[in-house]
Amino acid sequence: MSAVVVDAVEHLVRGIVDNPDDVRVDLITSRRGRTVEVHVHPDDLGKVIGRGGRTATALRTLVAGIGGRGIRVDVVDTDQ
């Protein structure tokens, strides 16, 4: 199930951004649970987050629907 979540998020994010080759999606498992980390080109960060966080919220809703409520989605700022 986790591979399906990662593939779905990667496919959607690649469709949103201007630099699809720079998209990387990782599934991190820790004692806090599972987290899908989305790494994009710094110029595309605003597109993935969306106005008022709407796109990021939609990604989180999609992940909750596919993988259950125990998976978090983090959009990683690669500038820092």
Swiss-Prot record:
Keywords: Cytoplasm, RNA-binding
Gene3D superfamilies: 3.30.300.20
GO molecular function terms attached to this record: RNA binding
PROSITE patterns named among the record's database cross-references: KH_TYPE_1 (PS50084)
Cellular localization per UniProt: Cytoplasm
Keyword Cytoplasm: yes
Residue ranges constituting the KH domain according to the UniProt record: 33-80
Organism superkingdom: Bacteria
GO CC, alphabetical: cytoplasm
SUPFAM superfamilies (alphabetical): Prokaryotic type KH domain (KH-domain type II) (SSF54814)
InterPro entries according to UniProt: KH_dom-like_a/b, KH_sf_prok-type, KhpA
Keyword NAD recorded: no
Protein role: A probable RNA-binding protein.
HAMAP family linked to this entry: KhpA
Family as reported in the entry's similarity comment: Belongs to the KhpA RNA-binding protein family.
PANTHER family to which the protein is assigned, alphabetical: RNA-BINDING PROTEIN KHPA, UPF0109 PROTEIN SCO5592
Protein's name in the database: RNA-binding protein KhpA
Species: Mycobacterium tuberculosis (strain ATCC 25618 / H37Rv)
